[in-house]
Each structure stands twice: as structure tokens, then as C-alpha cells.
Amino acid sequence: MSIFRMIPFQYFDAFTNMALDEAIMERVRTGESLPVIRFYGWQPSAVSIGFFQGIRDEANLAEARAAGVNVVRRQTGGGAVYHDQFGEVTYSIIGREDLFPRNILKSYQFICDDILFALQTLGVNARFVPINDILVGEQKISGSAQTRRNGVLLQHGTVLYNVDVERMFAILN
């Protein structure tokens, strides 16, 4: 078991959120930081685009601009995510790769098990569904994405609780 530094929940804009994760990855890589779990929100609401996606393919940029929603690219893969300022908590887990299972599916399960434990402690009957989702009943409430770079793993994840679904579908393609 390793000790992690926990950064409590804070709101930042999309660009600051992604820059913080990149800076933390670099500090973990150089040994200047313990592994980190960071909880955060997006102010204003934002769309994060997976590393390998085309921004214009995934987001209606005119609608996002009109709604005051930032659009940013993540370091992690996966699909486009709408981050509702008032409806979700995002987490980043950043640590040396040797702290996590090498197998991608097992590493998602390893990290999501802790998210499940926290949700179940709060009375939420949630379950992990491979490869990287957490469901309550048949409703997805959490998804995550990873990257591994220079010996460091970064996993982003969201836990949804009150998303403006109408706005989300207006902005995501």
C-alpha cells in the first residue's frame, strides 16, 4: 500500500484543471511528489475531449461558446465528456505505473473499486462494468479514462449526480 497526497475539491476552469494534472504528472515522474488523488469541479461547465478525438467531431463549438462552456483536450483517451459545473465531481489519480496493475482492465477495476467503496459507504448501490464504467441499476454514473506516460499513470474519472442532460446533448455531437 502506498501513501497518496489528497488534494481536496476545488473549482477551476477547464484549462487550469488539465494543466494541473499535467504538472502533477511531471512532479510524480521526477519524484518531487507523492502519488496524488485530486477532486475537482469545472467552473464554468466544460467539455473535455479525449486525446485521440477530433474536437469538431465531438462538440458543437458554436453551442458551447454560446452557453459559456469551455472545450479542452484531456491527456487521457476515451470519449468526450460534458462536465456540468453543478452536477458532477471529477477525480484524477496520478502515480507511478508500478503502483497499479499493468493490465489496463485490471488497473481500471483496481481504481474503480475504491470509487465503488466510497459510493457504497454513502449508501449508493453501484457496480463496476468493464472496461471503465460505474453503474447504478442500468444508469451510468461514472466513467474514466487513462494514460500512461514516462512511467506515470493518470486516470481521470467523473461521478455524476445532477447533470443538465439537455445542455449536455446540445453540446456533445
Where are the predicted features?
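Active-site loop/lid in soluble adenylation, ligation, and acyl-transfer enzymes
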Residues: 1-70, 74
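Generic detector of intrinsically disordered, low-complexity, polar/charged segments
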Residues: 47, 65, 74-76, 140, ...
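Catalytic beta-strand/loop module used to bind and position nucleotide/cofactor moieties
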Residues: 81-83, 88-173
